[in-house]
Amino acid sequence: MPVPVDDSTAVLEPTEGIERPTKPAVKSRKRFVGSSKAATSRPVVRRVANQVPDDILHDKELNAAIAALPGNYNFEIHKTIYHIRRDNVQSVALQMPEGLMMYGCAIADIIERFTGALPMMLADVTYGACCIDDYTAKEMGAEMIVHYGHSCLIPVSQTTLKTLYVFVEIGIDTPHLSLSVRRNFPSSRSAFQRLILGAGEAAPGGKVPIALESTDESAQATPDLSTNDLPTRLALVSTIQFVAATQALRADLETAMPPLEKGEIEQEEEGMVAKVKRGDIGVWRGKYEVTVPQAKPLSPGEVLGCTAPKLNDVDALIYVGDGRFHLESIMIANPTVPAFRYDPYSKKFTREVYDHTEMRGLRGEAVKAARKNLDDQGSGSWAVLLGTLGRQGSLAVLKSIQNSLPADSLPPLLLLLSELSPAKLALLPNSQISTFIQTSCPRLSIDWGYAFSRPLLSPYEASVAVGRVKGWGGLSLDNGKEGGKLEGEGDYPMDFYADNSLGDWTPRHNPPRPRPARVRPQAQGCAQD
């Protein structure tokens, strides 16, 4: 049995090739000599800005109250209490998605008990950070709003009152996640393409089995690490709750596991048998080439239902999270990249597919119908729907749509709506309105556009309809009075809140500034006599 080593008494051996100095090094002489009035005392420890004081972190009563909340959910109660006390907030609004509303009353009780501030729960539906309702909170008399479950999509410098975003990071079984990836996805690129991508395709919207989940003996055997093949290239994404878990997964996958070590030898009837850990059997032990993509201003690895990064040179993407809404965003933006989903609650891996042909066909028909209605002035005008659910509505996007319409077209009708539904829009007469352009969320048009009796376009699709941009691959539009066809190219973009979006029909479009040309100074010639 190996004897443990006491690090405090370990002796460092001389490093080969490096000679130890035989005498102390001579200190360099000071160029300037002066007197110092500084006292020889311990260095001053400065507290980081917004760091929670110890009296809040170690408050026994507060920690006992926090213990009533799920331990793997980080609601950042200490930080919230600190900000309320520091700014002497008397009333605070709490906003969270429906999945977290069950904890809202407990959080409100804790805030009221330990700060004295009056908590107000905003119970309107909250789909994302774009729904932060600082306007309503301020009108209700709140001095601060705490928004749970989403990232800082709307900067705190733009909100009308003090704003605190709480991501609600959720702790998951990261070792299980890492081993699940290694058990199902070969670290060898050629083996991955043969065993995983060769598993076949499923019906649109369905799932296909992962090859290594079969009962074949070759799939259950310990993978051979003797190959010098290139590593499998994986892209890791998730919602904001699991971004920390994806970063930990990246660190695990980028480091090769050590070779299997034989355990204790036991004597059995058939001979000597070496025991190994059960979890080490059938695990690919090589390292992977991992990418955590970013679509700024989102965090690295974070995806929204409307915003996802483009992927380059990856063999597959792995999404950590429950449901498909956010995953579908990056699948739409990257139709050729195989997608897999790890559900941290059920701890299951599934391969996910998306019917890009059907989606593009439906959206193409809506764009064509809207363009036809625009050319036919007798069919009614376009209506622009400005979303009023939180911060979904963008005046910049509204102005972009209005300016993109042809000068000879009917002026658009402006409508303000918090939530859209086919029944509500059906109340508006067909003779006056032919097409709806909604600015709330592109996924309303992509996922539910077929349910409306008239075209319901996103700002990007409206820009395609008026000819500002070509559109996606497979889309062919009549070029109006100029004749001919406008052929689309590329993929359907999912960049609604990205800084580097395609155009100003998105809220945060920030075109790259042209760099000023550098003028090289002229060489001065020597004067001749």
Curated annotation (Swiss-Prot):
UniProt-recorded Gene Ontology molecular function terms: 2-(3-amino-3-carboxypropyl)histidine synthase activity; 4 iron, 4 sulfur cluster binding; metal ion binding
Entry's cofactor comment: Binds 1 [4Fe-4S] cluster per subunit. The cluster is coordinated with 3 cysteines and an exchangeable S-adenosyl-L-methionine.
One GO process term, biological-process aspect: protein histidyl modification to diphthamide
Localization annotation: Cytoplasm
The keyword Acyltransferase belongs to this UniProt entry's keyword annotation: no
Main subcellular location: cytoplasm
Pathway: Protein modification; peptidyl-diphthamide biosynthesis
Catalytic reaction list: L-histidyl-[translation elongation factor 2] + S-adenosyl-L-methionine = 2-[(3S)-amino-3-carboxypropyl]-L-histidyl-[translation elongation factor 2] + S-methyl-5'-thioadenosine + H(+)
EC number(s) given by UniProt: 2.5.1.108
Keywords: Cytoplasm, Iron, Iron-sulfur, Metal-binding, S-adenosyl-L-methionine, Transferase
Task of the protein: Catalyzes the first step of diphthamide biosynthesis, a post-translational modification of histidine which occurs in elongation factor 2. DPH1 and DPH2 transfer a 3-amino-3-carboxypropyl (ACP) group from S-adenosyl-L-methionine (SAM) to a histidine residue, the reaction is assisted by a reduction system comprising DPH3 and a NADH-dependent reductase, predominantly CBR1.
Family: Belongs to the DPH1/DPH2 family. DPH1 subfamily.
Name of this chain's protein: 2-(3-amino-3-carboxypropyl)histidine synthase subunit 1
